[in-house]
Amino acid sequence: MDLHSAIRKSKYFGFGVSPSCTGNVRKPEFFAFLAQTKLGAITLSDIPSSTFSWYTGEFYESQSITLELGKVARFGENDHKLLQPTFDAISELISIDGYKDIEFDESDIDIYKSTRTLFKKTNDFHFTFDAGVPNFTFFEKGIHLASDNGQEYYAAEGGEAVVFPNPNVQIGHRTCMLMQPTQIKIVNNQVMKS
């Protein structure tokens, strides 16, 4: 697990980004554990990334995830009570007795699928919305999201939620991830989007 605090506000106090790897890094038992942390959501990435969770999942087939817990604040200003379920779940996971065997119930957590990732192609890239919007801000189908030197981006069929919007990245880097709520299915002991 790669633990972070988000730079911006979010619809969810905590959420996870599950990497897209060639191995089985999305076992139902792991998702059951994640639900015990009381995360609000898990996003299912669909492309490789430069994260620690992707690297360990891809090269070591570990159950990997990046957790965004709360929002960055000055030391001592975060409400640690909100982190207690995560602390308790991790403590139980690493205890001598091991983690209790529980079934994953997808109703315990919101699941999102990645619909696409926008990358900055030129220095003309800009969002048409305030880049400071909270993670998981939802845009209805057809809403103009961004422009990049004549390339226009609109919210897709069914609408899309934006995660990690940042127009100030270098050319070639991710400016945001776009997501939609999804149902899941278990295939070969792996959680997959329906």
Question: How would you describe each model-predicted region?
Answer:
Residues 2-194:
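Structured catalytic-domain cores with a bias toward divalent-metal coordination
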